[in-house]
Curated annotation (Swiss-Prot):
<comment type="similarity">
    <text>Belongs to the invertebrate defensin family. Type 1 subfamily.</text>
</comment>
<dbReference type="GO" id="GO:0031640">
    <property type="term" value="P:killing of cells of another organism"/>
</dbReference>
<keyword id="KW-0582">Pharmaceutical</keyword>
<dbReference type="GO" id="GO:0050832">
    <property type="term" value="P:defense response to fungus"/>
</dbReference>
<feature type="disulfide bond">
    <location>
        <begin position="40"/>
        <end position="71"/>
    </location>
</feature>
<feature type="disulfide bond">
    <location>
        <begin position="57"/>
        <end position="76"/>
    </location>
</feature>
<dbReference type="InterPro" id="IPR003614">
    <property type="entry name" value="Scorpion_toxin-like"/>
</dbReference>
<keyword id="KW-1052">Target cell membrane</keyword>
<dbReference type="GO" id="GO:0005615">
    <property type="term" value="C:extracellular space"/>
</dbReference>
<feature type="propeptide">
    <location>
        <begin position="21"/>
        <end position="37"/>
    </location>
</feature>
<dbReference type="GO" id="GO:0016020">
    <property type="term" value="C:membrane"/>
</dbReference>
<keyword id="KW-0165">Cleavage on pair of basic residues</keyword>
<keyword id="KW-0399">Innate immunity</keyword>
<dbReference type="GO" id="GO:0042742">
    <property type="term" value="P:defense response to bacterium"/>
</dbReference>
<keyword id="KW-0472">Membrane</keyword>
<dbReference type="Pfam" id="PF01097">
    <property type="entry name" value="Defensin_2"/>
</dbReference>
<keyword id="KW-0295">Fungicide</keyword>
Length: 80
């Protein structure tokens, strides 16, 4: 009985995956959207006296192998 239930579960999962796939003419390829202001808008906050404002931007720029960076008008600008 347990094998029958397991088989029915696997079969229903496979069937649902096949039915949920979009048709080839329905597939829409959209470009990747980059949010350039995330490090300066979302991550600029202060909690218990600790401000993250320009630190998140500087870390982002260092990860891009730049010398650092800061927020200017809500946009992270990296130094060369």
């Amino acid at each position: 009985m347990a094998k029958l239930i397991a088989f029915a579960l696997v079969a229903s999962l496979c069937l649902s995956m096949v039915l949920c796939n979009p048709l080839p003419e329905e597939v829409q390829e959209e470009g990747l959207v980059r949010q350039k202001r995330v490090t300066c808008d979302v991550l600029s906050f202060e909690a218990k006296g600790i401000a993250v404002n320009h630190s998140a931007c500087a870390l982002h720029c260092i990860a891009l192998r730049k010398k650092g960076g800061s927020c200017q008008n809500g946009v992270c600008v990296c130094r060369n």
